[in-house]
Amino acid sequence: MPTSLLRVGVVFGGASGEHAVSIRSARTVIEAFSAPENQERFAVIPHYIDREGRWWGPAVAERALEQNKALDAHELPQPLPAPGLRHWPVDPDSVDLWYPVLHGPNGEDGTVQGLFTLMNKPFVGSGVLGSAVGMDKLAMKAAFAAAGLSQVPYMGLTAADLEDPERLEQLLTRVEQELGYPCFVKPANLGSSVGITKANNRDELLAGLHQAAALDPRLLVEQGVNARELECAVLGRRHLRASVVGEIRFDADWYDYETKYTEGRSHTLIPAPLPALVSQQIQAMAIRACHAVHAFGQARVDVFYDETSGEIWLNEINTLPGFTSQSMYPTLWAASGIPLPQLVAELVDTAQE
């Protein structure tokens, strides 16, 4: 292998409910690196993290990529070590730069970013702070509020609040008075709409809170709004750039997990049919959102737009967005004139700034 090639460690999988999506994203990223213009610059070294958090080197990683699914315990080298990162699968100095393609806890929450930081190695995407704040919806929204960014009204609470009858009654009353129905209950630290429920009355609100509390000790209740769901991709480090704006339209009451991942239940419009001024406002908001949480490298920012009132509300930021061939992040950049091979190369270049 020529020493002039930058050795990129693409790490994927992970001890997360979004393990399968991570594998699909990694396949797209690695395929983009195989483009002729990238083969002259980069050598990819894939690393796989199994569902128990064990790290594996290229031989196992390539098998997971080929099968396009999680490897079961019997498909892994035996005897299995204890769960978690117990040993490094390859010489750490054999990788020049890390490219995490991980979604959810233990991947985009600052943990693996901290590991790469301790290794003194550059990596694609946000650092520890931006990743951690971007993962936790309550911390994220506090940062957005401090930056003066418009958001849908919300309330934060904890799983412990549900165990105190008096405290719970006070919170339920506050939700009904300040947010009203319908409202949405969300775990603070999960992605892909996992654990999110819509509540139209107190019984549904209670059920949603208990369901979310089983997944995360930090909870969020958000006012429901009748609005279009729009997304914008951001790229860069010192100088952030925003993509064209895209829209998600769906055949459901709201954009839940089933709708998101069932073929034919939703479709995208890129670019979104919007007045030019609205698109510009959303692009500016996306960049401000990144600055608010100290996110850089790559991010996808989701907003709500009420075309009747003209209001735009910032929903959330995703600092390690999906990267499958159908995912919004690469699709938005392709529509903005940056094809996949160029996009992954720019992300690597950004990580070295």
UniProtKB/Swiss-Prot annotation:
Disulfide bonds: none annotated. InterPro entries: ATP-grasp, ATP_grasp_subdomain_1, D-Ala_lig_Van_CS, D_ala_D_ala, Dala_Dala_lig_C, Dala_Dala_lig_N, PreATP-grasp_dom_sf. Keywords: ATP-binding, Cell shape, Cell wall biogenesis/degradation, Cytoplasm, Ligase, Magnesium, Manganese, Metal-binding, Nucleotide-binding, Peptidoglycan synthesis. Mg(2+) 2 binds at residues 316, 318. SUPFAM superfamilies: Glutathione synthetase ATP-binding domain-like, PreATP-grasp domain. It catalyses: 2 D-alanine + ATP = D-alanyl-D-alanine + ADP + phosphate + H(+). ATP binds at residues 176-231. Its EC number is 6.3.2.4. Residues 141-349 form the ATP-grasp domain. It is an enzyme of class 6 (ligase). It holds the Pfam family Dala_Dala_lig_N. Pathway: Cell wall biogenesis; peptidoglycan biosynthesis. It is found in: Cytoplasm. GO terms for molecular function: ATP binding; D-alanine-D-alanine ligase activity; metal ion binding. Gene3D superfamilies: 3.40.50.20, ATP-grasp fold, A domain, ATP-grasp fold, B domain. GO terms for cellular component: cytosol. Cell wall formation. Belongs to the D-alanine--D-alanine ligase family. This is D-alanine--D-alanine ligase. The lineage of its organism: Bacteria, Bacillati, Cyanobacteriota, Cyanophyceae, Synechococcales.
